[in-house]
């Protein structure tokens, strides 16, 4: 495992990338953020001389991707139909190399229950959880997880549909709020402490963790609005924690990333428990935000990588996970 700084290829010729598509927008609840991310990526690629073009599957038939003549695409979609393996599967069918994780890793990481169960099998620390349903025994849920606790859709991002519940009486409404977005709803143990995030670049033994960022939100409320549209959230990069503790968290995040089979890039959210500093993995994002408020560009800047250079290198990592087998012949 490596945890040193990620260094872009110094001799990368932008023209060698060919015609690059930036897939943005889409049909998820995170469309607004995806448009911000994608337009930032598009501008960065063009500023480096790349022949880059937008493609929005929210307004164009997604099957039209095959006719665009893209040599590769940068996926700037967030949430469903973009971060869950669906667009990745389509691109595999079309034979168009793409950035980020493949079909299975994307699907696993998008599903919080699947992610947490897999991490548990690898003995990786993640908060306890219960899957909810309309007739749940709310008192039993609170007894198991304690209060406060978190209720959220199993397959949404950007804190959409999330509620911090402080009493049993609040659980039914929190469940209904999340259930309007997803049929699968999770109640998760609340970990009191510092919220961190850690970006990872690469694949397998070459996976590299970027510096940790500590997120300090007003009233510890790092919701959708505070993530993207306000300036009162404070980001500390590198996170002000001892170097040995930071290295342990980075190593844990790389383990979590590998366990899901992620490649290209990703970003994990972590809580550091207040009373003992123990880290807990919350989730893995396989198509992180690239807006002006986003955290991966911030971590990259901390090791001397500009937004434009990061995006250029990201585009260069586009690949296919599957190989065509139509030419296979038995030996």
Swiss-Prot record:
Its EC number is 6.3.2.4. It catalyses: 2 D-alanine + ATP = D-alanyl-D-alanine + ADP + phosphate + H(+). It holds the Pfam family Dala_Dala_lig_N. ATP binds at residues 142-197. Binds 2 magnesium or manganese ions per subunit. SUPFAM superfamilies: Glutathione synthetase ATP-binding domain-like (SSF56059), PreATP-grasp domain (SSF52440). InterPro entries: ATP-grasp, ATP_grasp_subdomain_1, D-Ala_lig_Van_CS, D_ala_D_ala, Dala_Dala_lig_C, Dala_Dala_lig_N, PreATP-grasp_dom_sf. It comes from the Bacteria. Mg(2+) 1 binds at residues 269, 283. Disulfide bonds: none annotated. Residues 116-316 form the ATP-grasp domain. Pathway: Cell wall biogenesis; peptidoglycan biosynthesis. Keywords: ATP-binding, Cell shape, Cell wall biogenesis/degradation, Cytoplasm, Ligase, Magnesium, Manganese, Metal-binding, Nucleotide-binding, Peptidoglycan synthesis. Cell wall formation. Belongs to the D-alanine--D-alanine ligase family. This is D-alanine--D-alanine ligase. It comes from Ralstonia nicotianae (strain ATCC BAA-1114 / GMI1000). The gene is ddl.
